Each structure stands twice: as C-alpha cells, then as structure tokens.
C-alpha cells in the first residue's frame, strides 16, 4: 500500500492506493487513464507483510516508486508501463527520499543513508 502525497502534473494525478496500485487520473474529471500493479506483497512473504510503497515521485519525466522491501519500480507516466524493476538493497524505507538534481537520497529503518543516481 502507499501512503504518500500524490503527484500532480499537467492534467494528470498519480497516486498509489492501499492495494499497491499506481493510478493515473484525469485531474478535472477523475477518469482513470491507467492502473499499474506495483505489488501489494513481496514474493514469498506472508500476507500480513504489506509491501509499503514510497512515491510516486516524478523525476526526469519518469515515475519512481520505492518499496519497503528495497525494490525500485520506474514507470512511464504516459502508458503506466513498468520500465525498470530493480532491487536497491535498502530494506525498511519508510521516510520519503530527498531528491536533489539527479540524485535520490534514501534512509532505511536503521538510519543508514544511501545515494542513487
């Protein structure tokens, strides 16, 4: 599930719902452009372990989403297609990242800070 502020750009609103779905809506009509499944649970995890998502974040015309279990998913803002899925090795990400220029700074549950470019 997601629990962050939606991103609004142009006529689109991007938001992650409680079921781990990234949704693109029309800002004026609330019509749904597309829905992309990010994953409510991590593979192999019990249903009690929700895969919480940080995001969405619009960076360089791409939508970035980071899971509690250290998975990064980059999504096309136009089609909702998942362009990249990658393990970033950060478990316990619960605090929104800091985004500066071309870098993303993320901390884990042990207060370690990581930089991604």
Name the predicted role of every residue range.
Residues 52-77:
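C-terminal hydrophobic structural anchor segments
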Residues 13-15, 23, 62-65, 104-106:
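Conserved beta-propeller blade signature
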Residues 23, 27-41:
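Histidine/lysine/aspartate-rich catalytic loop segments that bind and position anionic ligands
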Residues 73-91:
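C-terminal/domain-terminus segments
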Residues 26-30, 76-80, 117:
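Short loop/turn segments that connect beta-strands within beta-propeller blades
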Residues 1-9, 35-57, 85-101:
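Extracytoplasmic beta-rich repeat domains
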């Amino acid at each position: 599930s997601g629990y962050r502020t939606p991103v609004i750009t142009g006529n689109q609103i991007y938001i992650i719902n409680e079921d781990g779905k990234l949704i693109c809506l029309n800002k004026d009509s609330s019509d749904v452009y597309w829905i992309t499944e990010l994953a409510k649970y991590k593979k192999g995890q019990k249903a009690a372990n929700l895969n919480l998502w940080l995001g969405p974040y619009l960076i360089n015309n791409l939508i970035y989403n980071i899971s509690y279990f250290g998975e990064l998913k980059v999504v096309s803002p136009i089609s909702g297609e998942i362009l990249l899925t990658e393990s970033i090795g950060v478990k316990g990400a619960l605090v929104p990242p800091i985004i500066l220029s071309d870098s993303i700074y993320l901390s884990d549950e042990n207060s370690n800070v990581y930089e991604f470019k």
